Amino acid sequence: IFFILSHTIDTVAVAISSHCELGVDIEQIRDLDNSYLNISQHFFTPQEATNIVSLPRYEGQLLFWKMWTLKEAYIKYRGKGLSLGLDCIEFHLTNKKLTSKYRGSPVYFSQWKICNSFLALASPLITPKITIELFPMQSQLYHHDYQLIHSSNGQN
């Protein structure tokens, strides 16, 4: 069994697979003042930073958090931590299409918006069925309808 954890302010994400390593990241969407601009310019690829900076503040921050969770999921999947660098992979997000550029074997990405957070999953396999359950810190279990916002075909 393979599993990985991620957490944000009041939510924990756990990804479990009986077949392969996974990468997961969850981040609560929150205001970063203008620091999201500096972070993206210093740690993302030049094209990603340009895409983020060119947007109005709110949309730029949303794109920043989408990119951040995808990058973190990928880095966790590869098992190398931040030593890989956040610019080791480049993402292009348009409508419901996600494409990526990186070196190595195919990786499949999925991303969801859950309440006020983005959740990203990286896997070497296309996973036909993904179950998401929310376990809030308050110890009550409740279920939400989740909206898939991006998915890739595993090709560079």
Predicted region positions:
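Core catalytic alpha/beta fold that binds nucleotide/phospho-ligands
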Residues: 1-156
